[in-house]
Amino acid sequence: TGERMAVVGPNGAGKSTLFKVIAGLMKPDNGKVSVFGAEPSGHICISYLPQHSHVDWHFPVTVSDVVLMGRTGKIGYLRWASAKDREIVKYALNTVGLGSFSGRQISQLSGGQQQRMFIARALAQEADLMLMDEPVTGLDTPSQEELFTVLDSLKSEKVTVMFALHDLKLAASSFDRVMLLNHRLVGIGKPQDVFTKEQLKAAYGDRIQILEADHDIAVVDDTCCGEVEE
C-alpha cells in the first residue's frame, strides 16, 4: 500500500521480537501472525533489515553482491543471475542513489549508505513489506534526511514500511501511523491519537516525565541522564 508505520516503545519493549515474528524468523508463543491476510511464509514477500550492530560489515562482499541477494528467491540457490536480475539490481541501486557504489566493499560505506543499500536489496527482492529495525541509530541528520528521501520514493513502489525507532517527534512527523509497544500493543493509529499522556505513561511507566508545549509532547527519561525523546 505504500504506508509507513513507526514502531516505538522503550528499550526491551519487544520491537525487534515483533519484527522477527512477522518475518517468520521466530514463532509466536501463541496465536498466529497474518501479513496482508496471509502467513509470513506464504506468498507475501518480506524484507527484514536488522539492527546495524547485527551485521558483519567486514565480510568481503560488494554493494552489488548484497543487493543481488534480494533476487535469491527468484533465482534459486544453484542458478546464475540473469541479465534481467542484474538490470533489476542496477535499477534498485540507482533508485537509492548508489548506482556508482556497486563495486565497493560494504565496509567502505557510511552508515546512511549502508541503510540505503539494504533498501535497494528490498527493492531487488520486490518486497511487499519492509521491516527496518532502528535504521537511524547512529546516523547524523543529513544521513537521516537522505534515508527518508529514499523511503519517500518507496510510496510509488507500493512498499509498506514498518520502522522501529525511539524518536517520538520523528515518528509523529514522518509516518502515516504509529504502533506503541511495551510487551503488548498499547496503541496503534495516527500519531496524534496514539501519543496521548495516558498511553505514553502506559508504555514508558513512572520512570519518565511528560512535558507538553505548543501541541508537542516531550518524553524525558529520568533513568538515562536527561536523555530526551520527543
Enumerate the language-model features and the residues they cover.
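ABC ATPase nucleotide-binding domains
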Residues: 196-198, 202-230
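H-loop/switch region of ABC-family ATPase nucleotide-binding domains
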Residues: 165-166
